[in-house]
Curated annotation (Swiss-Prot):
Positions of NAD(+) binding: D33, A34, V35, Y36, D37, S82, L83, E116, R139, E176, K295, K319
SUPFAM superfamilies for the chain: BRCT domain, DNA ligase/mRNA capping enzyme, catalytic domain, Nucleic acid-binding proteins, RuvA domain 2-like
Taxon lineage: Bacteria, Bacillati, Cyanobacteriota, Cyanophyceae, Oscillatoriophycideae
Organism: Picosynechococcus sp. (strain ATCC 27264 / PCC 7002 / PR-6)
Protein name stated in the entry: DNA ligase
NCBIfam families assigned to the protein according to its UniProt record, in alphabetical order: dnlj, PRK07956.1
Keyword DNA damage: yes
Length: 678
């Protein structure tokens, strides 16, 4: 039995959001690109088939995650877009057909493509003023990154001064910082001798190195850099570059290292030959590459095609197939998450896979184990495609040892021994004991997280200590902790205890939306929590809201509405709210915020007007546009009717646009909407 669409969508979103957080915020990625790509494509397919289940916090509705705060945040002068992925030549052909259809005029016969190896490292943006390097930053979310100029100055292949006699006043260079394989091996050997944790792969090592606060460590690790694009001012003495190939040659002239294995290909047949050559040849390269970047060479065509919300239309990444490897299953264990979800894992003999040592693989759920007929002792094939960690692809039954027995999924929670429950229509078994240590542990870590109450010092290690020493039995208990109690914990001194007490006290001042998110209501992400807080300004209003009222809020679907209703029906949750209120937590928008919102809405020209949003807008997500409309006093609905005042239409607007025109409803593009909202 496969997962029901709502359940699978929730799983996919959760997995992708965790991976994006680790990649963009922590710079500590644990998911290979091939894994993320496959998950993302499955999510897109499910949301296309079930558009009513799309939520505002879905990874498909956003560009990226926010940068970390340990370094100074900087806004990129020109956004760093992601690349669309193709996983076979059929998808590459479809991409070519799309951009050809998008060009209204005649396609030049000599347009051609530039093929470059996709380096598995960290994207970097460099800014030069009058030829001098003044800023270097990570990609971040594509709009905002982290300034790491001092660290980038240590990379010998990044020139501090451009090799030009009369440089332009401003030059933006983009490229990839990476760690050569030989250097990576030496670093890990040194870390092993020092008793330090080993880097999982060169990509992780490069990301971690760039975020070192001590640039001397960065210099010692000898990162490398390939430049792959640049942006020049249109005025002054800037050279007129007409193609990607010319840009790469000019980058070389300025003193940058560009990948020598690039190639100018006249057509997709040549692109295919290039890809196949390097699919085999990459194994001999001194660095890791996970695919080929294919770009239209002609800059005029690039300018005409432009960008989608996330990708340039004139470029695509053709990815290598995910790697597979055989290994032996030593054990099957189950983990319990903060929502009580029980996930089986295969513990395996260590095996190298795409530069990573793999010892565990997800088995998803009980049904997947039965489908595979997986048994302890089996030889299996695992791959890096489809989950946060590797998955078991198939069992090599012919290699099965004698006397193996089918695996019996546990009927009771391994953490608290409560009976597991598998809700009808769901593939995941759950522990429903709110006092389960695993659920409590996950709930506390979530509550203290950066996007929730942001309690500095209350990470997983300290949470485990608090639970093991019997100091907390619920989230609310942290507000009763004393400095003396904390100092009784291992490695918790007086200063650390005082800092944690202060951080816990400060969390009482966090806004209502953060508190809602911190409660960990199933399916309620950060964006959903903000929507709920805006539409139900007090917890009392939210608790009294019916399923229909919740579902009627733009951005809150059936699944979220039912989850909120169910959560408030649980006695233990009501007791938790009561304790948190007694502790002084905020369960309402401030009166000032409510008053300002009401005044703004009442005075605006769109107050009381009804909007429908459809298609892909150039810069705003639909949820962002909806929130701007509601903030000005307008209403947003999901369907077009005679009561609709405005239809906001982006690309691929579809049937809603047709119906609006039939009814004579006024159409707005994004710019017109923003003008109306002023």
């Amino acid at each position: 039995m496969s997962d029901a669409p709502p359940t699978r969508l929730a799983q996919l979103r959760s997995q992708l959001q965790k991976a994006a957080y680790a990649y963009y915020v922590l710079d500590a990625p644990f998911m290979e690109d091939a894994v993320y790509d496959q998950l993302y494509r499955e999510l897109v397919a499910l949301e296309t088939a079930h558009p009513q289940l799309i939520t505002p916090d879905s990874p498909t509705q956003r560009i990226g995650d926010q940068p970390a705060t340990q370094f100074t945040s900087v806004k990129h002068n020109i956004p760093l877009y992601s690349l669309e992925n193709a996983f076979d030549f059929g998808e590459l052909t479809q991409w070519e057909q799309r951009w050809q259809r998008a060009l209204a005029g005649e396609i030049p016969s000599d347009s051609g493509y530039v093929c470059e190896l996709k380096i598995d490292g960290s994207a970097i943006a460099l800014t030069y003023e009058n030829g001098i390097l003044v800023r270097g930053a990570t990609r971040g979310d594509g709009v905002t990154g982290e300034e790491i100029t001092q660290n980038l100055r240590t990379i010998r292949t990044i020139p501090l001064r451009l090799n030009l006699d009369n440089p332009p006043p401003l030059v933006e260079v983009r490229g990839e910082a990476f760690l050569p394989l030989e250097t990576f091996e030496k670093i890990n050997q040194e870390r092993e001798k020092a008793g330090e944790n080993l880097f999982a792969n060169p990509r992780n090592a490069a990301a971690g190195t760039l975020r070192q606060l001590d640039s001397r460590i960065v210099a010692a690790r000898k990162l490398d850099f390939f430049a792959y694009t640049l942006h020049l001012p249109e005025s002054h003495n800037s050279p007129q570059l007409n193609s990607q190939w010319e840009a790469l040659e000019f980058l070389k002239k300025m003193g940058f290292r560009v990948n020598p294995n690039r190639e100018l290909c006249p057509n997709l047949t040549a692109v295919k030959n290039y890809f196949e050559k390097w699919d085999e040849g990459r194994k001999k390269l001194p660095y890791l590459t996970d695919g080929v970047v294919v770009k239209l060479n002609d800059f005029s065509l690039q300018a005409e095609l432009g960008f989608t919300q996330k990708f340039p239309r004139w470029a695509i990444a053709l990815k290598y197939a995910a790697e597979e490897a055989p290994t032996t299953v030593k054990d099957i264990i189950v983990n319990v998450g903060r929502t009580g979800a029980v996930t089986p894992m295969a513990v395996m003999e260590p095996v190298q896979l795409a530069g990573t040592t793999v010892q565990r693989a997800t088995l998803h759920n009980e049904d997947r184990i039965k489908e595979l007929d997986l048994r302890i002792g089996d030889t299996v094939v695992i791959r890096k495609a489809g989950e946060i960690i590797p998955e078991v692809l198939r069992v090599l039954v012919d290699l099965r040892p004698e006397a193996t027995i089918p695996y019996e999924f546990p009927s009771h929670c391994p953490e608290c021994n409560s009976a597991l429950v598998r809700p009808p229509g769901e593939a995941v078994a759950r522990c429903v004991n709110s006092s389960c240590p695993a659920i409590l542990r996950g709930s506390l870590v979530h509550w203290a997280g950066r996007d929730a109450l942001d309690i500095q010092g209350l990470g997983e290690k300290n949470v485990i200590l608090l639970i093991e020493h019997g100091l907390v039995q619920s989230i609310a208990d942290i507000y009763d902790l004393t400095s003396e109690q904390l100092q009784s914990l291992p490695r918790m001194g007086q200063k650390s205890a005082a800092n944690l007490i202060q951080a816990i006290a400060h969390s009482k001042n966090q806004d209502y939306a953060r508190v809602l998110y911190g409660l960990g209501i199933r399916f309620v992400g950060k964006v959903n929590a903000e929507i709920l807080a805006q539409n139900f300004p007090t917890l009392e209003q939210l608790q009294k809201a019916s399923f229909a009222q919740l579902q009627g809020v733009y951005g809150i679907g059936e699944e979220i509405a039912q989850s909120v209703v169910d959560w408030f029906r649980v006695d233990a949750n009501q007791q938790l709210i009561e304790k948190l209120q007694q502790a002084g937590l905020t369960f309402a928008q401030t009166q000032t915020a409510q008053t300002q919102t009401a005044q703004t809405q009442a005075n605006h020209q769109i107050s009381g007007k009804t909007f429908v949003i459809t298609g892909t807008l150039p810069t705003l997500k639909r949820t962002e546009a909806a929130e701007k409309i509601k903030a000005a006093g307008g209403k947003v609905t999901s369907s077009v009717s005679k009561n609709t005042d405005y239809l906001v239409a982006g690309d691929n607007a579809g049937s809603k646009l047709d119906k609006a025109r039939q009814l004579g409803i006024q159409e707005l593009n994004e710019n017109q909407l923003l003008e109306l909202l002023v």
